[in-house]
Amino acid sequence: MGRLSTHVLDTAKGRPAAGVRIMLYRISGQNHRKVKEVVTNADGRTDAPMLEGAALEAGVYELVFCAGDYLRASGQAGEGVLFLDEIPIRFGVPDADQHYHVPLLISPFGYSTYRGS
């Protein structure tokens, strides 16, 4: 049974990023269908997988992390326009029976991601 999970770490503060809103979209051509919206818990994780079992299908997905709201709330944003606000990560799921973990490591001026385990 496959599943999709994520978590967010604040690399500037060296701790999990709690309270980050995340939207998951299924991408099909020009169509973007919102599948789920969650907020990270105190551990920077979601309380349940983003998708699992039959809900996870092979295809293209996009996670959109609302980093700007988090950076403002955590006192890491100055006045005016942020360098990073919404961070989209588009990725493919070739085999819906596998586990796909897509973490986000953020700071006010950079981010990184990878396929985790």
Give, region by region, the residue ranges found by the protein language model.
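Beta-strand-dominated extracellular/periplasmic modules and repeats
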Residues: 2-94, 101-103
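Compositionally biased low-complexity segments at domain edges in trafficked proteins
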Residues: 94-117
